[in-house]
């Protein structure tokens, strides 16, 4: 009996332990591996992956290099681009410092960023461009879809799941990624006084976000949705994730005006001329954001404040034509595949920009306006073999005439 039992005994092909010495042995094609060797392999892979991630971060572009990258894709907002370049560089420098230092005397805080600016001013695009230039996982979340745990809506941990998915479930990469939370102004408290009722989408969500922004080990449901007691969770440390939050903060300029006006009355001094909304945006301080409805603890975790300016007609025309992936260049490339040249008159570009401003859509509305103008042209051109050039005029943008077609 003993001989038969010995013949049936299964041994791990790697450490040589038998099935009675370990908890589990997994059988492969003529090969066996025990649970202890699996755990050891996972730890080795984890350490090597972490080293690879840190090596990538060591090559973080310097602020001037980041600014050059942003300038290739983003028009205007020079002050904001400089602030972002410095904040992002310092963030990844902090990670390298923390991972490699031997002493624990200096605790470097994260440079999370709050971007304030009107719709279509480039908040999301700036964050996307930064993440792409750094080759780190990037996720976008909408604050309006978030609610406190226990209420119908999306838990804040689902933001982390999006980042994990963007990292192809490589947790080490995800832990050094960037998350952009849009519409953050929509979860502001409805007033400075604390309500006795539950604030499902306001202060409660800010408190929930606060935990993951400042750094915590969060439990994330791998399939998303609500947490269940028996569900297996993904553990992710958020201390090195860079959070960029943004919002339009409509009406905050009135808070700034009130604060600046009070100073004039109080001290009898002439304040510097502030003639437009954009100038007021440059004057925003933490006190104004708190009055708008973000709680002090939340504001305190967003030390870098970047206020974007309202884009002008000239800015939007530059956005249409100058960046590497400018919309005009994209449509010119599309028509070139049909052997047709595309040209926009200067006043046509200005008319497109003016429409975007009238619609209050900013840069994000430019594509839909061009689509309206170009739809019939793009429908007809593939069937018109004699057309060599299309010229878009102001009249075509205004809907008063068709684009001009030139033939050979």
Curated annotation (Swiss-Prot):
Entry-linked SUPFAM superfamilies: Glucocorticoid receptor-like (DNA-binding domain), P-loop containing nucleoside triphosphate hydrolases
InterPro entries named in the record: AAA+_ATPase, ATP-dep_Clp_protease_ClpX, ATPase_AAA_core, Clp_ATPase_C, Clp_protease_ATP-bd_su_ClpX, ClpX_bact, P-loop_NTPase, Znf_CppX_C4
Domain spans labelled ClpX-type ZB: 1-53
Residues that, per the record, bind Zn(2+): 12, 15, 34, 37
Keyword Nucleotide-binding appears in the UniProt entry: yes
A Gene Ontology biological process term: cell division
One term of GO molecular function: ATP binding
Pfam family, one: zf-C4_ClpX
Binding site for ATP: 118-125
Keyword Metal-binding: yes
S-S pairs: none
Entry superkingdom: Bacteria
This protein's UniProt keywords: ATP-binding, Chaperone, Metal-binding, Nucleotide-binding, Zinc
Any one GO cellular component localisation term in the record: HslUV protease complex
NCBIfam families in UniProt: clpX (TIGR00382), PRK05342.1 (NF003745)
Quaternary structure annotation from Swiss-Prot or TrEMBL: Component of the ClpX-ClpP complex. Forms a hexameric ring that, in the presence of ATP, binds to fourteen ClpP subunits assembled into a disk-like structure with a central cavity, resembling the structure of eukaryotic proteasomes.
Role played: ATP-dependent specificity component of the Clp protease. It directs the protease to specific substrates. Can perform chaperone functions in the absence of ClpP.
Similarity annotation: Belongs to the ClpX chaperone family.
Protein name, per record: ATP-dependent Clp protease ATP-binding subunit ClpX
Record organism: Streptococcus thermophilus (strain ATCC BAA-491 / LMD-9)
Name of the gene encoding the protein in the UniProt record: clpX
């Amino acid at each position: 009996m003993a001989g038969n039992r010995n013949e049936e005994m299964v041994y791990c092909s790697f450490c040589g332990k038998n099935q009675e010495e370990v908890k589990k042995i997994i059988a492969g094609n003529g090969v066996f591996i025990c649970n202890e060797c699996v755990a050891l392999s996972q730890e080795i892979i984890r350490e090597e992956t972490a080293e690879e991630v840190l090596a990538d971060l060591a090559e973080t572009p310097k602020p001037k290099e980041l600014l050059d990258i942003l300038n290739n894709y983003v028009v205007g907002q020079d002050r904001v681009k400089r602030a972002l370049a410095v904040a992002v560089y310092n963030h990844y420098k902090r990670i390298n410092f923390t991972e490699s230092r031997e002493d624990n005397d200096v605790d470097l805080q994260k440079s999370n960023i709050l971007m304030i600016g009107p719709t279509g001013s480039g908040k999301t695009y700036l964050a996307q461009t930064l993440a792409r230039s750094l080759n780190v996982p990037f996720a976008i979340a909408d604050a309006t879809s978030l609610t406190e745990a226990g209420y119908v809506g999306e838990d804040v941990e689902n933001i982390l799941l999006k980042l994990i998915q963007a990292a192809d479930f490589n947790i080490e990469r995800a832990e050094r990624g960037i998350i952009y939370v849009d519409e953050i102004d929509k979860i502001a408290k409805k007033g400075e006084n604390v309500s006795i009722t539950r604030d499902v989408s306001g202060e409660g969500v800010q408190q929930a976000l606060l935990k993951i922004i400042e750094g915590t080990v969060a439990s994330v449901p791998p399939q998303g949705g609500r947490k269940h007691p028996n569900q297996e969770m993904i553990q992710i440390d958020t201390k090195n994730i860079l959070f960029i939050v943004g919002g339009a903060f409509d009406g905050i300029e009135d808070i700034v005006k009130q604060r600046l006006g009070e100073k004039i009355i109080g001290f009898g001094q002439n304040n510097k001329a502030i003639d437009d909304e954009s100038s007021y945006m440059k004057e925003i301080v933490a006190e104004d954001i708190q009055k708008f409805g973000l709680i002090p603890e939340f504001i305190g975790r967003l030390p870098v404040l970047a206020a974007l300016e309202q884009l002008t007609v000239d800015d939007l025309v530059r956005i249409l034509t100058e960046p590497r992936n400018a919309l005009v260049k994209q449509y010119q490339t599309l028509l070139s595949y049909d052997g047709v040249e595309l040209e926009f008159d200067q006043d046509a570009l200005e008319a497109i920009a003016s429409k975007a401003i009238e619609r209050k859509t900013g840069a994000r509305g430019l594509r839909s306006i061009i689509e309206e103008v170009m739809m019939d042209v793009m429908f007809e051109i593939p069937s018109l073999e004699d057309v060599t050039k299309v010229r878009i005029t102001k009249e075509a943008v205004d809907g008063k005439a068709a684009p001009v077609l030139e033939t050979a």
